Amino acid sequence: MNPSAIVSNRHTRARESTLRQIARIGPFLEGSLSPFKRLGCTQPGWHLTFKQHGRTHTLYVPMELVAEVKQWTLNYRRLKALIRQVTRHSRALIHRQVANRRAANHSKALMSR
């Protein structure tokens, strides 16, 4: 289906708006940042936990990068939510196109009788 065949409606506008938000997200990183206790230290250490090829891995995060890595993981969660929104609006556009085509075919069939 070419883009010109899609009539602009609320789903098209919402999808375009969400795509613009995705473009502004910035750096992202999949995983969870978790503190762990270090012997003899009052401050916790930090690990990034993530899945790779079906296995869980952890990566030590130096203290000077913790704030930045937290932001990256938050950006990743936000990105996933935005992708779900784009998907929902794209499915709605497909559903609307199919419904419009069925209605047009139905009215043609009634007119030809």
Language model feature labels by segment:
Residues 1-113:
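A positively charged, amphipathic N-terminal helix/segment that binds anionic biomolecules
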